[in-house]
């Protein structure tokens, strides 16, 4: 679930950390659900006060989820819960230590199928370009990132699944 609240000027705002003060409203992270809440004025009904929904709310949600995911990915990397590059991810997947993966959105179909071939049930988030993933790993471009089964990676996996659901309409994997 993702949380929304409203500012003192009565604008609906996306609460990417889920910790902003005030009355909040939790919504399923699918784009269609958020759009439905906007269209049917569910925010005003839930907050028990008239609120304004910004025209770019969907963009704010996507940007906020991306920002939060990349931030948590950086923390997981510093905590040693991340491997990258196809061979390293494949090894982690095969020995059971990887429980989640990121795949570049702009990867070729062949590159996307390589990892799926080994573990079809592995959850994958394909919401970032190879350059965005590369920047997080200190490289120019990265196609595959594996998230290891560690306690520190749990918030990252939860946020990445929300982002994937919001961007793709369904969880992949």
Question: Which residues does each PLM region occupy?
Answer:
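N-terminal cysteine/histidine-rich coordination modules
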Residues: 1-45, 49
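Extended interfacial segments that mediate partner engagement and assembly in macromolecular machines
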Residues: 32-102, 106
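Helical mechanochemical/support elements of P-loop NTPase systems and associated helical scaffolds
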Residues: 24, 39, 65, 85, ...
